[in-house]
Each structure stands twice: as structure tokens, then as C-alpha cells.
């Protein structure tokens, strides 16, 4: 991303009416609940959200932006076509956590030379974007902290992304720290507690969670959110002290 680029009596109901009422009530009560997975403890809180099943775009919408490219599912991945300049997808879910969670996904740049899966996600009451391959193809970091973009703040890293290659990203968010890995290699850990956390205007339409490309065609798959354990939260807070 460059500086210039870039939801009284008692009355008895008939049996059929009562059943219908109960069914509607149950549907309302369960709407929007996370899908339980094999990783969730029986009877306990849901610990993992599967945000993309590899088959369709349920739970997602095309991000509206100027001359945005198309979005489709192909070979088990969401393909985001190149736009003029940006394209993207945005989650329509209302049950996303805002802290003590891990967002993980796999992404590749199919063509182009800029960011191909910039991921916007919740951080407490705000949001931030992980840029991957911005500013000409290699800058990786958070936009924005204290108004400084990924190319200007302490999270800036230079990563060489090869077109056609899948990369695995993991981002963990706690009340104090945002920590990132690429292909299981820690990229950065930053304490944001006393910093202003905010997205750039260009990725604000990806809130609460979404992905964006810049003059590049990208693909995203295996999108999940997992709640962190107490041990992981403690480890994250220590990681930012190094």
C-alpha cells in the first residue's frame, strides 16, 4: 500500500401453534452462534470458528470499493480478482471475538506485485490490518499504530513473497499484544496497549474482518478463528517484552 494508492384467563395455544412458536424461538436463540468443532470441549465454550468451508461464500460479501474485481470460490479457495486498485471480501458474521483469539489463514498472490490478502480484524473496540506484500511487494506489518502505516512503524518487516506460493499466516490478539507468524516463523510481537489502533481508510470497508488485494489477484483459504488458552495469552504478553 502506498501513500497515494491505495449488519383474565389462561389461553392455551394449539399444539401446532406451540410447536411453531418453539421452533422460531430456537432459531432466533441459535442464530449467529459459532459452529462447534471437534476441538471444542463437550458442554464448554466454542473455541474455534470455521469461517470458510472451501465450498461457498456463506458468511462473506464482496467488499464494495472503486472498480473492485470479482470474488469467486475456486479449488477450495476464495479468489479475489485484481481491482483498480483494490478488491476484497468482508465477513458478515456478528459473533467474532475481539480479544484473546487467533486468526489463521493461508493465502497466495496469483498475479501482481503488491499485497494479496491484507487481513483486517478486531482488536478490542477497534480494528487493524495486517498488510502482506505492500509498497511494491514485500512490506509486511500493521496499519496503523499511532497513525503510522506498516511501512513506518515497529512492526515493519520485509518478506519476499513468490507468486503462486501458499503462505500460512497466524495472528494472535490479546488485551495487550498483537503477535504474527508466517509459515510458523514469528514475524513480530507488539504491545499496542498505549497506542492508537486504527485501520486506514482504504481497508475500513473490510471491518469487522476481511481480506483485500491491491492491483493483485489473491487467493485465501483455511480461514479460522481459535480462542487462546490462558497459557497462550501469558506467552503473548511476554513475547512483546523481548
Predicted regions and their residues:
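N-terminal secretory signal peptides that target proteins for export/translocation
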Residues: 1-11
